[in-house]
Amino acid sequence: MYKWAVYFLKEWNESCENVWCFNMDEWADGDGNTITGEASFQSAMENAFYNPLGKNTVPVSHRNFALKDNLPTYPEKIAKLKAEGAKLVLVYGIGRMCHIAFWEPMIGAEFNSDEEWLNQPYRVGVKLHPLTIEQNAITSFRSRTTLVPCRANTIGPKLMFAADYAIGGADGALSRGMQWQGMSLWMTLRYGPTRYITSSYIPTLPGKLFYLKELAGPLCPDAN
């Protein structure tokens, strides 16, 4: 998804020297220790965005990854930037179980109200929903469920829904009419805000959500 951003930033010779980035999540263990290598989101961001930008890239000191020691610094850093006039843009996808970042639906049951839930800035070593693991096996691990970590570090509602603007994408369509994301998209847009469906708060933010036509339905059985 970064290919065109890289293309136009380089074509127009636009510098990212005033851009600050905060990766929303990272694979981790129960203690928040993160993975390295090709499967990590840090590696993906560096290889798809930062490195291809060359001289136009985001300064290294402005790059934030959801590591155990760095994730807790996000609220203060973001608040300071916003106080200085920065705009916070949320770039997101919608998970199979309607998570944003890795803020899973079952976390909602831990709180007595949406207001309390909305005040959570991040979580280290969060346990992932089984369908989240299966989704990532399909999309990122070439079907190898056993390679997908069961936990992750993630930002929470307090940070994601403080965004001034949101840009989302839903492209969970496979071949021959198969897909995994249609119901998740419908729930996001039609259910109404609730802490039990994280992405249901997305329509409360200004922004744009791009989706593939087939995800819009009808969501009817079709033998493949």
Language-model features, listed with the residues they occupy:
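Glycine-rich beta-strand-to-loop/alpha-helix junction loops that act as flexible
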Residues: 1, 92-96
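Active-site histidine-anchored catalytic micro-motif
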Residues: 2-37, 86-87, 100-127, 150-151, ...
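Ligand-binding beta-strand-loop-alpha-helix segment within the catalytic cores
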Residues: 12-89, 146-147, 211
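Conserved acidic residues
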Residues: 85-91, 164, 207
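Short, catalytically relevant binding-site loops at active-site mouths
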Residues: 96-99, 107-108, 174-175, 216-217
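Gly/Ser/Thr-rich active-site loops/lids in small-molecule metabolic enzymes
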Residues: 104-140, 145, 187-202
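Catalytic cores of processing enzymes, dominated by hydrolases/peptidases
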Residues: 122-163, 168-169, 181-182
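ATP/nucleoside-binding phosphotransfer catalytic cores, i.e., glycine-rich phosphate-binding loops
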Residues: 154-224
